[in-house]
Amino acid sequence: MGPGSQQKSEKLRSKSPLADMDGLHAQYVMLETIGHGGCATVKLAQHRLTGTHVAVKTIRKREYWCNRVISEVELLMMADHPNIISLLQVIETKKKVYLIMELCKGKSLYQHIRKAGYLQEHEARALFKQLLSAMNYCHNQGIVHRDLKPDNIMVEKDGKVKIIDFGLGTKVKPGQKLNLFCGTYPFSAPEVLLSTPYDGPKIDVWTLGVVLYFMVTGKIPFDACSIKKLVKRILAGKYSIPSRLSAELQDLLSLLMTANPKLRPTVAEVMVHPWVTEGSGVFPDPCEEQTPLKPDPAIVKAMGHIGFQAQDIEDSLRQRKFNQTMASYCLLKKQILKECDRPTRARPVNPSVTPFPSLVDTATTRLGLRRRENEPTCPWSSANRQVSVCGKSTSKKRDRRVSWPSVLGRPRHTAPTMDHTRTRTRSVPCICSMFCTVQPNSSEESTQGHTRASAADKPVHSRGWPRGIKGWTRMIGNAMRKLCCCIPSKETSHLGQNRVSPKK
């Protein structure tokens, strides 16, 4: 490893306050594997502090792959777009790099098309415009993906697209040529197969054409029984186009898959093509879900009660440190927004009176609070029980369920699952849902592979709180009341009243 790579590695390590294995498991419950590749695996995990599911990509650091690993981390740190997978935290050890990312709940574009056969043009247009928005953002940032294919594009249940896996991506300067041959043969541009210096953004345009063709036909444009014949067909740039496709779409496909890269359009030029702008020329706003530079004071105050420092929160967001503080803030804010978007089934109340949160489940738990300097306390541990990596408790006794006030925990809440139709009691998002296990469910597909989670096994819970904690819960409750305008009052909360979980 060269000195430049060592400096980059040290830079990454400095961004992570918990740079050891214990740090990873102290913050996340590792669940089942949901994807794997040549030098990396992706696991489903649960953030202990918020109970939110995340994807943890584990990359082994080897001499040959080290520069590529660092490149992927840096690219994800640069990217902040609603249609690009969000990086939340980086934890690095001597042998591994852990990338904690948001969990995309849906299917890959490949699975989506295989199930549908092919998409109608208006359906394909809705997805393709999101891809264009993301790739235009990347190219403006000097990022080239180089492996854009249906397996690396996630489609969530609400139709939102997320581009994942920047493992072959790189950073380029204007006019810079690339030499590395990489990607997948059926999606590779002719100039890459010729092993000549190529323009990075232009090969992304070619793969966008192959992906669009796959969406509207259910097939790839270039296919053959051998690599040699496949390369020959790609270099010739000849493929069949179904006559049922509109003239505008046929024209767009021919532009995207132009064999000569000099004649191939840029992504910005594709975005104004008549087929793309038909119906509406509006594209996703890149600022829609960007990480805030200035934190919400109410969230900061609430996080302060569980050990976070206000200045550390502000610095972590402004400098994009991708540490524990930044991850906790981002996951908590997403939970709050999700809760605020929920429809409520409450009794009519006096419109002139602002509802206040209710202490629905007043069961309390005992937590031993131990905190390092400038590090938030994560009160999920119990001195009388041990939790294995897979989340199963070694204790055979049935403990009481962990509960916070409704502003901090979900009352009567089972382990979160991928099942969006599961019912549960209405409450404001939890800061400390102490679920120590979520077992996989073989029936549900999800993200970066085939994510599965289940509530078949009961979650492990900690023991009861001492009575003296009531004052603390009231203090945190007061701080959290400002977080969400849709917090129900005690009059409208019922333990037996469940409702459908929100569509994520």
Swiss-Prot record:
Gene giving rise to this polypeptide: Smok3a
Organs and tissues of expression: Testis-specific. Expressed in the testis from 22 days postpartum (22 dpp).
Keyword Chaperone: no
Annotated EC: 2.7.11.1
Region annotation (Disordered) ranges: 389-421, 441-468
Keyword terms: ATP-binding, Kinase, Nucleotide-binding, Serine/threonine-protein kinase, Transferase
Domain of life: Eukaryota
Enzyme superclass (EC): transferase
Family designation: Belongs to the protein kinase superfamily. CAMK Ser/Thr protein kinase family. Smok subfamily.
Protein name in UniProt: Sperm motility kinase 3A
The species this protein was found in: Mus musculus (Mouse)
SMART domains from the UniProt entry: S_TKc
Record GO terms (molecular function): ATP binding; protein serine kinase activity; protein serine/threonine kinase activity
Keyword S-adenosyl-L-methionine: no
InterPro entries in the cross-refs: Kinase-like_dom_sf, Prot_kinase_dom, Ser/Thr_kinase_AS
Its job: May play a role in sperm motility, especially in the regulation of flagellar function.
Domain UBA: 294-334
Active-site residues from the entry: D147 (proton acceptor)
Sites where the protein binds ATP: I34, G35, H36, G37, G38, C39, A40, T41, V42, K57
